[in-house]
Structures are given as structure tokens and as C-alpha cells.
Amino acid sequence: MRKADDEEQDVPTLKTLRESVNLTQPELSRRMGVGIRIIGDWERGESIPRFDRAVSLAKELGIPLKTLARSFGLSVEGVPNDESTN
């Protein structure tokens, strides 16, 4: 089995990420200013958030954007990690 396949198996779903910080769909919806249906669509993989919403979502969940991207099934291979420039 390829290494990428192994990594994909360990990727948490958006629902798992949300539940890991004890947020309900309604609470996350309220915090982000989006409808509950949108949160559900994201969790079911029916749509993915715009970049600005993805940034807000990552902040609310306390996760890196790369982790969020993986939860949507997006490849982040070759995307550099953020590094402090200060």
C-alpha cells in the first residue's frame, strides 16, 4: 500500500474534528455566521468552504488549514508548512 493511502486512512472527518472540540452544528454555525445546512453540507462532502470561511473554520476548530484541507479529501502534498517570519 502506498504511503499516501496510509495517511488518508488517518485523516479525521470534519464532523470528528468538530466533535473533538465539543461543538454542535448549531453552535459552529452561529460562531461562523453561516447556516446549519452549510455546516452539514461540508460535513457530508457535498461542498467545501470558500477560503475565507475555511480560515474561520480552522480557527474555530483550532486546527491548521492543512488538516482542514485533508478532512475535505484535498491533497496538500508539496504545500509548505507555515513558519513564523518574525
PLM regions: where:
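Short, charged recognition helix plus adjacent turn
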Residues: 2-5, 59, 67-86
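The DNA-contacting recognition helix of HTH DNA-binding domains
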Residues: 25, 36, 46-47, 65, ...
